[in-house]
């Protein structure tokens, strides 16, 4: 994941900052607790494709 991309992309729900989870290959919005998958190097920033991040994962 190109870290320059993280400076431009935002959560499609709240427009907040996304962080990169290297292990799970996801972009995570800590505000909405949503994780967006990265498929073949491309972030899929569609709310229906996101999974909810559990409280335990958010720690």
From Swiss-Prot:
Disulfide bonds: none
Species lineage: Bacteria, Pseudomonadati, Pseudomonadota, Gammaproteobacteria, Vibrionales
Pfam families with a match to the protein in the record: Trm112p (PF03966)
SUPFAM superfamilies in the record: Trm112p-like
Organism encoding this protein: Vibrio atlanticus (strain LGP32)
Similarity field: Belongs to the UPF0434 family.
A GO cellular component entry from the record: cytosol
Annotated protein name in UniProt: UPF0434 protein VS_2060
InterPro entries named among the record's database cross-references: Trm112-like (IPR005651)
